[in-house]
Amino acid sequence: MEQALENQGPAREPFNEWTLELLEELKEEAVRHFPRPWLQACGQYIYETYGDTWEGVMAIIRILQQLLFTHYRIGCQHSRIGILPSNTRGRGRRNGSSRS
């Protein structure tokens, strides 16, 4: 006969609270990188599509994560994960060879 597993590990904060904190952090970061009218239009679209639901919260989180990741990846000045321009990737050399 199977027994229910006991709660092991530290207590976690409720999912809803964690989700709202994540959304606030993403919004704060997005405001630093994107124009407010863009973000307001995105929020309005989500509200019109999903209403005031958890599905809408999850959708805006997903969109903000994708926007920020793409923004950082293509070269945000504040990011360390941006793509280097092709002319700085080896300073014109191929396969690590140097010509002197």
UniProtKB/Swiss-Prot annotation:
Q: Which gene encodes it?
A: vpr
Q: Which organism is it from?
A: Human immunodeficiency virus type 1 group O (isolate MVP5180)
Q: How is it modified after translation?
A: Phosphorylated on several residues by host. These phosphorylations regulate VPR activity for the nuclear import of the HIV-1 pre-integration complex.
Question: In terms of one coarse class, where is the protein primarily found?
Answer: virion
Miscellaneous note, as given in the UniProt record, is: HIV-1 lineages are divided in three main groups, M (for Major), O (for Outlier), and N (for New, or Non-M, Non-O). The vast majority of strains found worldwide belong to the group M. Group O seems to be endemic to and largely confined to Cameroon and neighboring countries in West Central Africa, where these viruses represent a small minority of HIV-1 strains. The group N is represented by a limited number of isolates from Cameroonian persons. The group M is further subdivided in 9 clades or subtypes (A to D, F to H, J and K).
**Single Gene Ontology BP annotation:** protein homooligomerization
Name of this protein: Protein Vpr
Q: Which residues form the signal peptide?
A: none
| Family indicated by similarity | Belongs to the HIV-1 VPR protein family.
The root-end lineage is: Viruses, Riboviria, Pararnavirae, Artverviricota, Revtraviricetes
Question: What residue spans carry the region label Homooligomerization?
Answer: 1-42
What keywords tag this UniProt record? Activator, AIDS, Apoptosis, Cell cycle, Host G2/M cell cycle arrest by virus, Host nucleus, Host-virus interaction, Ion channel, Ion transport, Modulation of host cell cycle by virus, Phosphoprotein, Transcription, Transcription regulation, Transport, Viral penetration into host nucleus, Virion, Virus entry into host cell
One annotated Gene Ontology cellular component of this protein? host extracellular space
Q: Which Pfam families match?
A: VPR (PF00522)
